[in-house]
Design a protein with these regions (language model features):
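Conserved C-terminal guanine-recognition region of P-loop GTPase G domains, centered on the G4
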Residues: 27-37, 69-74, 84-102, 248-249, ...
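Conserved beta-strand segments of the P-loop GTPase G domain that flank and frequently precede/overlap
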Residues: 13-17, 46-49, 81-83, 286-289, ...
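C-terminal-of-GTPase-core extension/linker across diverse P-loop GTPases
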Residues: 1-13, 33, 134, 138-212, ...
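Short alpha-helix plus adjacent loop in nuclease-associated cores
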Residues: 109-128
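Conserved nucleotide-binding/hydrolysis micro-motifs of P-loop NTPases
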Residues: 17-21, 51-53, 85-88, 109-113, ...
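Flexible beta-alpha connector loops of hexameric P-loop NTPases
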Residues: 19-24, 54-58, 118, 122-124, ...
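Switch I (effector-binding) loop of TRAFAC-class P-loop GTPase G-domains
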Residues: 189, 196-202, 220-250, 260-270, ...
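N-terminal accessory targeting/assembly segments
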Residues: 1-111, 417, 421, 426-427
Length: 427
């Protein structure tokens, strides 16, 4: 689709508060407004209803639905976004109540629409399309003529801004093809990860809330050339680059897709293969926008999602970014260790950050003597790159090397230890 599709999109944002507080709903709606802005729409008004449970037919109560219809017509609204997940029948019923010129989408459909706009790699585009076919397409069934008449738009775009396929006859076949292609890509990613493991280089993943400055930091440290915009989910595909630490060691640094509150589990699952970069990292940098008043809750969201991914036990370094803009909530660090303050935009504090990364990667190091056969010289290269070699003695069929190594490197080379501990947990 051309860009004119989203021009003139006037939207209303709707939230139903069934638990939590009105303040929580307002914070979430403010975030939804930023999502809509990223997708190219304009928020005209917001509506919040307190209700014990959502209405089965229209999510809103009948009186509130009628009120919404009045304000939609009065303000010439053509898109209504609900800050929740709507069923296909609820979307149909709401659109019938609001008029045939109004489209209704939910939070997941909006996020997927942004993903579709920003996916750059082949794998990213396939992941987005598969997620849309499983979630968005069933909510658009039978609307082909209507979408064509309305010009598609936010919530209906596929990767590359093509209109999303909604033909029921093609869906299951396309889903199977995408699942097979993505499984092959995931296997290739695992193969590449194994090859990186053999290099002995430590892996550090930058994770955190969307728009916290993850891509800006990777660009500053590695000249990665990643698009870094002041928009939500500007980066969707993970990018890995080599980064040199102060002591000369080279690590692999990865920028990952950002997190957001109320990120549906089906979206987490859809991007599991790329999020595995965080699961398999030796150290996580949790990036935080220090200037954001919601920094504390954003850390909690990030920590909860990492726990869901199985990365909750990873070593963590909290990186409070954008400190040149001021620190909104110093209390966000309460009870947390390993905290650094930087500005990825100006470079302030970045050298100290690199030094701390180096320290954390090598905590618990000890001196070990390895006996390396002459035909395994690649092992010697791993030691020189990732450890401190103190002594080397060449023999007829092997080399004995004494080096100071950390647990990660030792785990790779334990088989060559001349005096290994009886149990690996004795390290």
């Amino acid at each position: 689709m051309e860009n004119q599709i989203t021009e003139g999109v006037r939207a209303a944002l709707v939230s139903v508060v069934t638990r939590g507080t009105a303040e929580d709903a307002e914070i979430s709606l403010a975030e939804l407004e930023r999502l809509l802005d990223t997708a190219g729409g304009v928020t005209v008004f917001k509506m919040i209803q307190n209700k014990e449970a959502p209405d089965v037919r229209t999510y809103l109560g009948s009186g509130k639905t009628a009120e919404l219809a009045f304000y939609v017509a009065r303000n010439e609204i053509n898109l209504v976004v609900f800050d929740c997940e709507l069923s296909p029948s609820q979307i149909r019923n709401l659109e019938q109540a609001l008029g045939d010129t109004v489209r209704v989408i939910d939070r997941s459909m909006l996020i997927l629409d942004i993903f579709a706009l920003h996916a750059a790699s082949g794998e990213g585009k396939l992941q987005v399309e598969l997620a849309q076919l499983k979630y968005t397409a069933p909510r658009l069934m039978g609307k082909g003529t209507e979408l064509s008449r309305l010009g598609g738009g936010i919530g209906t775009r596929g990767p590359g801004e093509s209109q999303l396929e909604t033909d029921r006859r093609h869906l299951q076949r396309r889903i199977r093809m995408l699942e097979q292609s993505l499984a092959e890509m995931a296997e290739n990613r695992r193969t590449q990860r194994v090859a990186r493991d053999r290099s002995g280089q430590a892996r550090v993943a930058i994770v955190g809330y969307t728009n916290a400055g993850k891509s800006t930091l990777l660009n500053y440290l590695t000249d990665a050339g990643i698009l870094a915009e002041n928009k939500l989910f500007a980066t969707l595909d993970p990018t890995t680059r080599k980064c040199r630490l102060p002591g000369g060691e080279t690590i692999l640094l990865t920028d990952t897709v950002g997190f957001i509150r109320n990120l549906p589990h089906h979206l987490i699952h859809a991007f599991r293969s790329t999020l595995d970069e965080a699961v398999n990292a030796d150290l996580l940098l949790i990036m935080v926008d220090a200037s954001d008043a919601q920094a504390a809750s954003q850390i909690e969201v990030t920590e909860a999602l990492l726990q869901d991914l199985g990365a909750g036990d990873k070593p963590v370094l909290y990186v409070f970014n954008k400190c040149d803009l001021g620190v909104a909530i110093p209390g966000a660090v309460h009870g947390r260790e390993n905290v650094m303050y930087i500005s990825a935009a100006t470079g302030q504090g970045v050298e100290r950050l690199l030094a701390r990364i180096e320290e954390m990667l090598h905590e618990g190091s000890r001196r070990v003597t390895f006996r390396i056969p002459n035909d395994k010289q690649g092992v010697l290269s791993i030691l020189y790159r990732n450890a401190t070699v103190e002594d080397i003695r060449y023999g007829t069929d092997a080399v004995e090397v004494t080096a100071v190594v950390d647990a990660r490197v030792y785990g790779q080379l334990r088989v060559y230890d001349t005096d290994p501990p009886k149990e690996t947990d004795q390290w």
